[in-house]
């Protein structure tokens, strides 16, 4: 665990877990808020395992998730990244699910990130070979997309398990909450990826899609989003 310069009692609560389970938790602390990219790298370089798994706060994952991801990496030495499908849930239960591509190629970077970030497991060696997450304010909120692009540009590959082994808390009625500056960041990350991966010239037009999405009225964006992810069980 790493406390990113919190000003409340977060560090005290975290310390209780360390005291109770000293063999399971290590506590790191930033003296001031350094942001997600820096903090992810700090944890990455302190981690001792061969495989690095992520999970966001307030989310849930299947008890089988880690074993299934480990099995993929153990049985496929040419694979560096493994992620899974995700379900979305709120106070009323599960309302949607992603539909990931099982074997993403460079072309899958054209329109969106090819991997869900939160449920991923990655070989530490692959992280280190690309120097982890790029610490750049222009890549805030798109650090994962840029990371995957760096890895693919360096010859690494990944796969997606087509099972919803992870549940992300997300309001089904949420409007388009991404600030416009982060859409500019997304456009910038897409330009970098298109260049790094030597994608066809025509694909540069897709770099502007994050900006176009940001111009869509929130209520329309919300309808599109629900139609994209809503499950038949909802």
Where are the model-predicted features located?
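A conserved acidic beta->alpha catalytic loop
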Residues: 3-12, 32, 56
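Acidic helix N-cap motif at the loop->helix transition within catalytic regions
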Residues: 8-17, 60, 64
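Short aromatic/hydrophobic "clamp" motif used to bind/position activated sugar donors
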Residues: 52
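The conserved acidic donor/metal-binding loop of glycosyltransferases
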Residues: 56-60, 85
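Non-catalytic, C-terminal membrane-associated alpha-helical segments of glycosyltransferases
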Residues: 173-234
